[in-house]
Regions:
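Alpha-helical DNA-contacting segments of helix-turn-helix folds
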Residues: 72-82, 86, 125, 145
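Hydrophobic alpha-helical connector segments
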Residues: 74, 89-117, 174
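Short secondary-structure transition hinges
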Residues: 113-151, 187
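Pre-recognition alpha-helix immediately N-terminal to the DNA-recognition helix
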Residues: 28-36, 106, 110
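N-terminal intrinsically disordered/low-complexity leader segments
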Residues: 1-24, 213-219
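Helix-turn-helix
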Residues: 28, 36-70, 74
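Hydrophobic/aromatic-rich alpha-helical bundle segments in the mid-to-C-terminal region
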Residues: 123, 158-204, 215-219
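Amphipathic alpha-helical packing segments from all-alpha helical-bundle domains
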Residues: 133-161, 168-172, 199, 206
């Protein structure tokens, strides 16, 4: 019995190692594409450029992506998830912030700071976002043990002090407001620098919350 268990363990470890190798190759391709799209531009980057920069065979690319447009879409979802997960991880280090609306404002502020520190992310993500595409990104889970963005949003919402009508529409309006007003402020300091925009932006987000509130939950 012990021998059989040992064989099972060896096989499980072997499968896990293979899965890790696959994930590493996929990550390498995404990182390569990100670097090339930012530095050379999407139109001037070929699949050959991506695989050569990643150090993998061209056939490996087609194990994960259909074409250049497909890897760009996966890349945007991947980067958007990374940014949100980093903001959410930071929120978890602040257990004193337990109000839903304050949590959303904290995550928004953290994401804007990440974008301000990395203009390449703003250029990649903001230029190609539409609600239809981003809605798919919201349900994208990068790893089996990592929840999707919208799953986290629903979890935070379930502990909110208020109930809200049309939570998805509320999320959409906040997303559009933040992405639409912050792009030029981050990249060009227009019409005002980001730090000057933030108080007005957050006041507008609070207005959206109030607009969608139904009632306060009973404790």
């Amino acid at each position: 019995m012990t021998h059989v268990f040992d064989i099972f363990q060896e096989r499980r470890l072997s499968v896990g190692k293979i899965d890790n190798n696959k994930q590493m190759k996929r990550e390498s391709l995404l990182d390569s594409a990100f670097s090339l799209f930012i530095n050379n531009g999407f139109s001037k980057t070929s699949i050959s450029d991506i695989v050569n920069n990643a150090g993998v065979a061209k056939g490996t690319f087609y194990l994960y992506f259909k074409d250049k447009y497909d890897i760009r879409n996966h890349l945007i979802a991947h980067k958007a998830s990374q940014v949100f997960q980093a903001a959410y991880s930071d929120l978890l280090r602040h257990p004193d912030i337990h109000d839903f609306e304050e949590q959303v404002l904290f995550i928004t502020d953290n994401i804007l700071d990440q974008f301000a520190a990395n203009h390449s992310l703003v250029t990649l993500i903001s230029k190609h976002l539409s609600w239809g595409f981003f809605k798919n990104s919201l349900t994208f889970a990068p790893f089996a043990d990592t929840p999707a963005i919208y799953t986290i949003y629903e979890s935070l919402l379930s502990h909110a002090a208020y109930t809200y009508r049309s939570p998805e529409l509320m999320f959409y309006m906040i997303l559009e407001l933040v992405s639409g007003t912050s792009y030029n402020a981050i990249l060009y300091q227009q019409p005002v620098p980001l730090e000057e925009l933030k108080p007005e932006l957050y006041a507008a987000i609070c207005g959206i919350f109030k607009q969608f509130r139904i009632r306060k939950k009973r404790k």
